[in-house]
Amino acid sequence: MKTKKNTNAVKRLQCAALLLPGLSQTAVAGRVEETYNADFQYGHYSESNRRMEVDIFQGALSAPIGSAMTASVNLVRDMVSGASPVYNFKDANGQVRQFISGASPTSSCGKSICEQRDAISSGLTYFFDGASVNAGGGFSREHDYTSRYFNTNLSFDFNKKLTTVNFGASAAFDEIAPSPSTWNSRDSAFKAHKTSQQYLLGVTQIIDKESLLQSNISFGYHSGFLSDPYKWVAFYDGNAFSDFQQDKRPRERFEWAWLNQYVRHFGQFNDAALHLDYRFSTNDWGINAHTFEASWHQPIIDDWQIIPRFRYYSQDKADFYQTVFSGRSENYSSFSSDYRLAGFGAISAGVKLSKEVKSIGYAESLKFQTGVEYYDHSSNYQLGGNGSNNFSNFSYYLVTASFNLKF
């Protein structure tokens, strides 16, 4: 009986591993998905003061092909509307303020930003005894941005399937064609390109019948046009305005990240699971970032589950970031006032509630899930920060609803 109990515990941990981001096909390399899966998710993102709003629609379908292969296809549509920070300036008192793009009577939604992004991706996974190989690609398009990307992943199980090693690689080829507007002075024929490469090495280890640990190291290299064509930078001589230039960033960026994830199963709490994640990332632009996340997966009754979640994030500013610059632009090789490159911290908390219904007609199971998340972005939350960028603080909430059908 002890052997059977231990085996069941290992299976529960393997299922818990499948809940970790990026592990749905790699945590158990030899595991073939034997059912058809259809997924749909809707999300609504809204920033404070309704500055920016996004509606996200996602659909996915996966199906077995024979006894050793799975195919998948994913569709995404994002619809964005609102306003965005364009540049920073000094007011009459010398205080730095943020200029936000306003309403536009000529746009389809009456706001300065009306975007729609459509994306499609697909993949094939072939399962061996104790290994799997995955290859896929995708295409994403907006009116001013097009991306084509490819990816592959290899996974190997050994140590009686208690250890899994993952190798991953991806490449993206992007084309940027900024739309002529008040904040883009480039010629309408202007086009730029960007390429990205990502590599991953990871290990997933079942420690004992109640716990699992995953560790990933990833490397990335980006080259080409890495600036934001709709951002501007102001230069001052003291408090006197001296120059105004478009965002100019280095044409290369190298980055690496280390992610550690720990899962602990608690059978005494109705098979609950604790997930703890820590991620450190750094790049040669000078941005070091820390992310800590904790979530508790609690089955309740009759296949209901609740998942409260907490996340903390902190990053340093880029070497070439300033709210406004002193002197003239000729004195700087790169410059940006984009708040995303500033030093800041963020705290978010949320909860998800799901219900699974089994054996519905021809379907094996149907799972519904809804969730809400609140995010607060502030320079005061930065590790070692001084709150100097508090003019760009904001918050948002994200509401999601989804279903998964297995048949």
What spans do the regions from the language model cover?
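Outer-membrane beta-barrel "beta-signal"
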Residues: 154, 210, 351-353, 394-407
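Hydrophobic, lipid-facing positions within transmembrane beta-strands of outer-membrane proteins
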Residues: 55-59, 118-122, 148-152, 195-201, ...
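Transmembrane beta-strands of outer-membrane beta-barrel pores
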Residues: 42-46, 77-81, 128-130, 139-143, ...
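Short loop/turn motifs that connect adjacent beta-strands in outer-membrane beta-barrel proteins
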Residues: 26-34, 67-68, 130, 159-164, ...
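Outer-membrane beta-barrel translocator domains and adjoining extracellular loop/strand segments
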Residues: 51-54, 74, 84-90, 137-140, ...
